[in-house]
Structure formats: C-alpha cells, structure tokens
Amino acid sequence: MTRRREKAVQPVGTRRAAREFVFRVLFEADRGDVPLQAVFTRAEGVMREGDDTFPQLGPDALHFAEELVTGLERHREAIDDVLHRTIRGWTFDQMAQTDLNVLRLATYELMYTPEPHPPVIESAVRIARKFGGDDSGRFVNGVLAGLSRNLREEVGESPAADMTAPAPADTAPADTAPADPAASEPDEPRDA
C-alpha cells in the first residue's frame, strides 16, 4: 500500500501575498459590515490553522499585512475622500466592491507608505484581474496611475520620478469604470 504524502503548505513571505490577504479581509469586512481588525484577527487564526481560504503568510508578510490593516482603519475616511475626488462620474455604490477595495488598499499605500508607486499599482492590478471583472485591471490601473501622478505633482516630483518598476500594461482613464459594475461584482472573491 502506497501512502500519499500530503503537500505541506509553505508560508509565503511576499508583499504581494500580504496585499491579497488584506484585500480578502477588507472585502469580507465590507461585505459583512464587520470591523476590519476583527476580520483580520479571525483570518489570521484561520490561516494559522492551515485553512486555505486565506494565503499562508510568513512572519514578515503577516506583519506587513497587519500594518496595512491598521493603516486602512486609521485613514479610511481620507482614503475614501481622495478616491471620491479621483474617480469622476462614478459613486462607490456604482462600483464593484472588488474594484473599490483594491483601490482603497492601493490608495493607502500610495498615500501613507514609502513604497514605490509602480509595484503597488502592479500588485493592485493583479489582484483586480484575479478577483474582479473583465475590465477591473484596466480600471484600477487608470485610477491609480492618475492618483499616483497627482500625488507626485503635489510634492513637486516629476511624474516620471518614481518609475523604478515597469507600469502594468493595462491603462484606462481615471474617469472610466467597468462597463457593467454590477455584473463584475461577485458574491465573494473568486480565484481566477
């Protein structure tokens, strides 16, 4: 009789995995109208038990995820205000929840962390493509590229000053959104 070896889930130590973890926490918190920190604590416990609902994070990635959650809670109002001013022609109610939460997460990083803008935008676009609708990646990229440009101009930097990583291939103007936001909003995050 041959025994099957169970594949051990190895923790991931990347910032991209931490961002996806926080996106899922943010999505669940908004969907269930539950405090973000409470969902994070529950998700961390589920992850530690080996459940694959949330990505397994190594210690550094988990610490980064916790910093993101704390910052999102602390600055949520300012983040939403900036997004309201940046996304012209769309209200939050008209947008897919996945797109909005990806934008909130990335906006926090662009505004309040020293992370270079291109990798933050690239990670956001990847998450949007994975969990959002057909046009989510382009929409998120367009909004964040415009926001990044505005933020750099506010501090007197050249828009090209932060080009330390290649920008994502998708581009769309910041005043556009997915053609049918309701159709692209799943009941819960989905794997691509």
From Swiss-Prot:
Pfam families: NusB. InterPro entries: NusB-like_sf (IPR035926), NusB_fam (IPR011605), NusB_RsmB_TIM44 (IPR006027). GO terms for molecular function: RNA binding. Belongs to the NusB family. The keyword Glycoprotein does not apply. GO terms for biological process: DNA-templated transcription termination; transcription antitermination. This is Transcription antitermination protein NusB. Keywords: RNA-binding, Transcription, Transcription antitermination, Transcription regulation. Residues 154-192 are annotated as: Disordered. GO terms for cellular component: cytosol. PANTHER family: ANTITERMINATION NUSB DOMAIN-CONTAINING PROTEIN, N UTILIZATION SUBSTANCE PROTEIN B-RELATED. Residues 159-184 have a biased composition (Low complexity). Involved in transcription antitermination. Required for transcription of ribosomal RNA (rRNA) genes. Binds specifically to the boxA antiterminator sequence of the ribosomal RNA (rrn) operons. The keyword Ion transport does not apply.
